[in-house]
Amino acid sequence: MTKPVIIGIAGGTGSGKSTIANAIQENVQQEITVITQDSYYKSFDNLPLEERHKINYDHPVSLDNELLISHLQTLKNNVPIEMPTYDFETHLRNKKTLTKNPSKIIIVEGILIFENPQLRNLMDIKIFVDTDADIRILRRIERDIQERGRNLHSILKQYRETVRPMHIEFVEPSKKYADVIIPEGGHNKIGIDMIVTKILSIMED
């Protein structure tokens, strides 16, 4: 089996990274393995819940990038991995893992995947999804309430204190590492078509 093509999709919270990943999957029509950086938060099980709530989860140090890099290298060698799962209400890693099998295309997506040089160097194509801040915060509110058991007050507090400052410090500057920048929150058909063409070209080489 040939080495897989690894595609990195970065962008701010709520920018449309999953939309791009789904669009690639629909258009390439190949089996795709999707790895989410959100699954690789460190498990701060040595701290009480109150202290875990205070951790800045938008800073790179909150992520277990060492494990993520190791897993991507393993997949690149055509070996399955056990991807961790994360409980966003307790801020702990679950005991349950998800088996991820290697495929011709591997997508890794997350807000900080371009911030780490070792992680960047594993990627064949780097995509940054560029979306206005007001749209991103609205999407984050909707997601965190529906999927992560959060309330509006805590979401807005986190946005002011960590999400926005960390976006300015780490996420936005990482845009310079992208091969392709897609505006309009992932709903850019021309941009997606160009990416799909490039992926197919790499796979044919």
Where on the chain are the PLM-derived regions?
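P-loop (Walker A) phosphate-binding loop of NTP-binding proteins
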Residues: 12
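Hydrophobic positions on the alpha1 helix immediately C-terminal to the Walker A/P-loop
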Residues: 20
